[in-house]
Amino acid sequence: MLTSYGTSTIVKTTLLCLLMCVVALFIPFIAQVWLIGFAVVFLLFTLYFFRDPERKTPNETAIIVSPADGKVMQIAPCTLPDSGLPATRVSIFMSPFNVHVNRVPISGKVTMVRYVPGKFLMAFDHASMEHNERMEIALDNGQFEVRFSQVSGFIARRIVCTLQPNDVVTIGRRFGMIKFGSRVDMVLPATVRCCVQQGDNVHAGETIIGRY
């Protein structure tokens, strides 16, 4: 299954690869092989990148699931942006080989969707969470607020987010993607018990990040 978030990119890539194959008809044989081979590999990688497998969200209450596929690269204490109360930041690195469709981490009401322009530092550079282009999102489940950010990277410069303020969403629902790698940062209130460790591989909509 392919994600609809990548339709335009898939169409453009397909047309480009077809053009390369046409050009290959008018060049020497060895060059033909290389160009057609490159076109096929490029198209297959694009289709692979925009895959969107089904996910089964745990049938449990009082959980927060991962909004992204990838590896937990940092768990660190922080403070909630508005109140200054203690919180925990969980940072997930998404490589180009991970599934890039993002999913809602907790059921609730969207209280904020804010685009922040910025730089395009490498995603594994922790300065990127504050200085890179990103989409900041807040969800209120009636007990507390969870914040998370889709962060652009050096390669990933296209954020897709379909959430709007006042949307009521359910845990595990698709809401967007970051094209071609990057990171997602979550800020969990201190009342949430973190259930992952640095270095853990996580899957969007399935891996339990925290319990409350």
Swiss-Prot record:
Recorded superkingdom: Bacteria
Positions where Pyruvic acid (Ser) occurs in the chain: 182
Positions bearing the site annotation: Cleavage (non-hydrolytic): 181-182
Cofactor note: Binds 1 pyruvoyl group covalently per subunit.
Membrane topology listed for this record: Peripheral membrane protein
Any GO BP annotation: phosphatidylethanolamine biosynthetic process
Keyword DNA damage attributed: no
Active-site residues, record numbering mapped to chain: 182 (schiff-base intermediate with substrate)
Cell compartment(s), UniProt: Cell membrane
Pathway(s) served: Phospholipid metabolism; phosphatidylethanolamine biosynthesis; phosphatidylethanolamine from CDP-diacylglycerol: step 2/2
PTMs per UniProt: Is synthesized initially as an inactive proenzyme. Formation of the active enzyme involves a self-maturation process in which the active site pyruvoyl group is generated from an internal serine residue via an autocatalytic post-translational modification. Two non-identical subunits are generated from the proenzyme in this reaction, and the pyruvate is formed at the N-terminus of the alpha chain, which is derived from the carboxyl end of the proenzyme.
Enzyme class: lyase
UniProt-recorded Gene Ontology molecular function terms: phosphatidylserine decarboxylase activity
Signal sequence interval, chain numbering: none
The reaction(s) this protein catalyses: a 1,2-diacyl-sn-glycero-3-phospho-L-serine + H(+) = a 1,2-diacyl-sn-glycero-3-phosphoethanolamine + CO2
Its biological purpose: Catalyzes the formation of phosphatidylethanolamine (PtdEtn) from phosphatidylserine (PtdSer).
Subunit structure: Heterodimer of a large membrane-associated beta subunit and a small pyruvoyl-containing alpha subunit.
Protein name: Phosphatidylserine decarboxylase proenzyme
Organism placement in taxonomy: Bacteria, Pseudomonadati, Chlorobiota, Chlorobiia, Chlorobiales
Gene name linked to the record: psd
